[in-house]
């Protein structure tokens, strides 16, 4: 099995996201997006709206990792936004 490179978008410099994504599009296997609601875990991070916007520049699938109290509330919005994996 070939190792996969799946960078977390939570750690990106969001002011330079287009430039960084252009580089990663040529090197990564998929993108990892953490979805946190501030309840299940204390952090609040990226959202279905971010996934929708990012999917327009991503050339690799987007994998969303749910750390939320009610995962069912996120599945359809993330799928509609362009997430390839949830």
Residue ranges and their predicted role:
Residues 1-85:
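Conserved N-terminal beta1-alpha1 strand-loop-helix module at the mouth
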